[in-house]
Regions:
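Bacterial Sec-dependent N-terminal signal peptides
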Residues: 1-26
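Outer-membrane beta-barrel domain signature
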Residues: 62, 74-75, 80, 92-94, ...
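Solenoidal tandem-repeat scaffolds enriched in leucines and small polar residues
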Residues: 180, 184-191
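Membrane-embedded beta-strand positions of outer-membrane beta-barrel proteins
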Residues: 47-51, 78, 86, 90, ...
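Residue-level signature of outer-membrane beta-barrel architecture
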Residues: 53, 80, 131-135, 177-179
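Gram-negative (and chloroplast) outer-membrane scaffold detector with strong preference
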Residues: 85-171, 181-183
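Short glycine/proline- and aromatic-enriched beta-strand/turn motifs that initiate or cap beta-hairpins
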Residues: 20-79, 161-164
Length: 191
């Protein structure tokens, strides 16, 4: 019975979703794709700020309490859409990480039942290439409510604390779910 309800939900939801996408169609009801007018450098620029919680996964972190592993996180980025489907951004992600280790390390402090608590700063300066899948498949529509944007990137990852630091090259990939709130403000859920 549950399956029947779920299937019915998807069938009916699909009908409503397609009914909302008619603003970028021509007289024959085909999706309009380009040509796109190019713009000046500072057109289609965006800025993002986010906050959250970091949860560090290390070798012995399952031994420590969950609440003591949570640390503050921050994300700031600036980007530009070059076409309705292709964009790029540069940004900072990080702030702090907490965890547990079985041996004294550069970032470890006090012992707790044979384990050492670690607390250190983290930062990731990165550049990402973004592809707006919604615009690529369904054509550009300025008033679209939801955009699905996969991205890949590369950057500099740094951990620091207790007079020690570590630098690495990092790679990232993810998905942006962009929900339009008004013409100048979006809510973005990033995974």
């Amino acid at each position: 019975m549950k399956r029947l309800y779920i299937i019915a939900l998807f069938v009916f939801a699909g009908g409503f979703a397609s009914a909302q996408e008619n603003g970028n169609r021509d007289a024959q009801n085909r999706i309009v794709r380009g040509p796109y007018e190019t713009n000046r450098f500072f057109d289609n620029v965006f800025v993002g700020v986010a906050g959250g919680v970091n949860l560090y996964f290390g070798e012995n972190d399952s031994e420590g309490k969950f609440g003591k592993r949570l640390a503050p996180a921050m994300d700031i980025h600036v980007g530009k859409w070059f076409t309705p489907s292709i964009g790029a951004r540069v940004g900072y992600a990080g702030l702090q990480a907490k965890g547990w280790t079985s041996a004294g390390t550069l970032y470890a402090k006090s012992a707790d039942g044979g384990l050492f608590r670690e607390k250190f700063g983290v930062m990731y300066l990165h550049a990402d290439a973004m592809w707006n899948f919604s615009n690529a498949v369904s054509g550009y529509k300025e008033s679209r409510t939801w955009n699905f944007v996969p991205f890949v990137g590369v950057g500099w990852a740094r951990s620091y604390g207790n007079d020690a630091h570590d630098n690495e090259i990092g790679f990232d990939a993810g998905l942006l779910n962009v929900v339009r709130l008004c013409s100048s403000l979006d809510l973005t859920l990033e995974a």
